Amino acid sequence: KPSSAASDVYKRQDKELTFWDHLDELRRVLFRVLGVWFVFAVGYFIAMPWLFDNVVLAPCHNDFIFYDVLRYVGKTFNLNDEFFTQQFHVKLININLAAPFFVHMSTAFWMSVVTATPYIFFEIWRFISPALYPNERRGVKKALCIGTVMFFLGVLLGYFMVYPLTLRFLSTYELSAAIENQISLNSYIDNFMMLVLCMGLAFELPLVTWLLSLLGLVHKSFLRKYRRHALVIIVIVAAIITPTGDPFTLTVVSIPLYLLCESVSYTHLTL
């Protein structure tokens, strides 16, 4: 059974709303979104010590699942390259007095934002749906569902593959034997959040393209005509996101993004 707020929206969808009606409904939406976000933020803040040890700092340890997969692949196919056999561990240091507290706060904030994304999309859908025609409602609902799923797939790929590869490369990169690499807590968290969220946003390509097609700015012929250009752009973006420079990392990041780019044409046709 829909909530009273949702019922009010759908009861009024057959008559034209005034500017103040829209503003009042938007205010309710913002309050609900902020309420859900606040609950997640408090929960993450309380659980942050455990999350740091078992999730956020997991890529620092040699037993992280992706490193185990690399070693298994190397052992199975008799690959002796250091990429597959490297033993890896990173110890972070803190050089700012207040850094642990602010990192605690900011990490809880961003985790709560990511977790609340499905609910935010749901509220967006519920707010705009009364103004749409039935066929537009079906399209927007499908696009928001796809966008939510793809965002979390991108976040998972960033966490389990892209960031560990980047961390392992940059933390072991040696400019001079006289320079010892010591990674600060702030540097680790900044790069962690940036890469994971960038992968999530990169996976929103189908949703963005669908919205552009809805506005008549992108067409099937355009996507097919500039397919090769898109591949070059994807490789460049992958190189920026993962500054490791090795072909393997560029490949594992570029392939999913390219497949998404190809799927956009299909999504454009069937949505």
PLM segments and residue spans:
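Membrane topogenic/interface segments and analogous intrinsically disordered interaction regions
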Residues: 7-269
